[in-house]
Amino acid sequence: MSAASIAAALIAALEAAAAREAGGPCALASVNVEMLAAPATGEARVKTERKTRTMMFLSAEYLTAAGERIATAASVHKVIAP
């Protein structure tokens, strides 16, 4: 598992969570990924921090099976009107 694949997994998880939470498509406006440890196999967990009618703010963590935090991410998404 490389740092690039961890970043890609975090971004994919953030985009999927934003679309699911909004009930439709969203555009990724910005994302910040921070690597905190050496790359390892794990999974992304996403949390919605704030949601308005037109914008969503999410955060994510990439954790190993043992619970070690490998990376974090924060993103802003524009909700696209149906």
Per-region residue spans from a language model:
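Terminal targeting signals and extreme-terminal segments of soluble enzymes
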Residues: 1-82
